[in-house]
Amino acid sequence: MINTFDWFKKWAGYTPDKIALKDAESGTTLTYRQINNASNSISYYLKDKYQLKKGDRIAIIAENDLTQVLLFGAAQKMGIILVPINYRLAHAEVEYLLGDSECSLVLYSEGSYDVHGLKYEATYEPIAPFIHFIDDESPEYEEQVNEEDPIFILYTSGTTGFPKGTLYTHKMLFWNSINTALSLTISSTTKTLNCMPLFHTGGWNVLLTPVLHHGGTIIMFKKFDAEKILRSIVSEKLDLFMGVPTMLKMIAELPEFESTDISFLNYIIVGGESMPTPLIRKYHNKKVPIRQGYGLTEVGPNLTSLHQREAERKQGSIGKPNFYVQVRIVDDNENNLPPNEPGELWISGPMVTPGYWKNDKATANSKSEGWFKTGDVALMDQEGFLFIVDRKKHMYISGGENVYPVEVERVLLQHEAINEAVVFGIPHEKWGECGAALIVKGKEISSEEIRDYCMKNLAKFKVPTEIHFIDSIPKGDTGKIDRKTLKSTFMKERDMA
């Protein structure tokens, strides 16, 4: 039985003793042979102990660690589906995701998430002991895995207020890896680190899976730590590094940054949001090129790349489409628009998701004749460079995390003392953006009580930083809240205060 998508089996045959993974904290290293052996053993363990089979779902609630890559290897071999879940979410949020994905097994890290109190019925097992499978040797696990079989369900916050599970197939991972390698010159000699969380596509699929697909080496960090990251870049002599502007700003503000030589980096990849020109120049002054790009969970995610030589000349651009990515910019009637005319950005290619888990309506609404509708307004200039004019309608990005106001509003409106609520993103010096909530009270309640309530029901990054009470929320003729005008008025009054 042939499984084309078993990457670790292939590399275990080509370069068995090459280091594929290194844990930044403990220094533990894993070769491609060890990963392949462990992935086989885990596959048999999951089948024999839990009767898991192709198509079954496993949730992972954990900080970054090497065991998650071993489970990824098992998923490639078995055809099971991994469901990474943000360990910063509240119990109610996690229960919704577990129920929606119908996971039968939940693996968690004891130090980062307390599963006690979760009402969802499943088998709960600590993830840490899975690392011991590296000492096992098992025969190759055999299963017919096809390109359209899912390997991930990655949840994104939905505009309806409920998260949607984006299906990731083996085909998507393959073509995203090829696109990334062609754009960023990734090969078996590539060495990088990953500090992006593995509950997002950015953690798995911006660099981690493309580098492992091509036989390179990854240094794994549990979480971002500016000082440790800078130290690792130097000590490991990395080829490239990926981070969001907030991370790069924190690194650049370290006292030792100015005296540290990082000119050996081929480039730094920037995602999540646009990088300010002064920050670009800080890295350029250290002879480190900057590669900005654009991506979405539903499409790979790596879609475009701005070559480092254009970083300042085309500042604000997301670059040009990657090799096997097709783009259109369309008007409201789905007609193609000429250069410099803003319209909705549509994407096509083999790295586009087949749809959302158990959500045919959302899947249908997101596509048109094979094109994925990003919901982002963009334009293409005369040279073919793309620019995002506006993000998805109301979403804001706080420290690299996408926050959908309607999700926060849904929680706020469940409180008996709140009659109306509007949330939007406002500038924040450290996190890029944070949330501001305008509240119409039904009963007496303080901003501190609202914040405490949110902390119990939402991830910390979703909790509004500013809470203001108003008498009423203005609405348009159709009864809809005019968020754009409301935010504009709020910002003007805030600036004048």
Regions found by a protein language model. Give the residues of each.
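Conserved pre-ATP/AMP-binding loop-to-beta segment of ANL
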Residues: P16-D17, E137-Y155, F162, T185-K191
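Conserved AMP-binding A3 loop
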Residues: T29-R33, I151-W175
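AMP-binding/adenylate-forming catalytic core of the ANL superfamily
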Residues: Y44, Q68, L89, G349, ...
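Conserved AMP-binding/adenylate-forming
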Residues: Y45-L89, N402
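ANL superfamily adenylate-forming
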Residues: G111-E148, F162
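Conserved AMP-binding/adenylation subdomain of ANL enzymes
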Residues: F174-K191, F199-L240, M250, L254
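Gly/Ser/Thr-rich phosphate-binding loop
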Residues: L238-G243, A252-R313, Q326
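Conserved ATP/PPi-binding loop(s) of AMP-dependent carboxylate-activating enzymes
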Residues: T304, K320-Y324, N335-S366, E401-V403
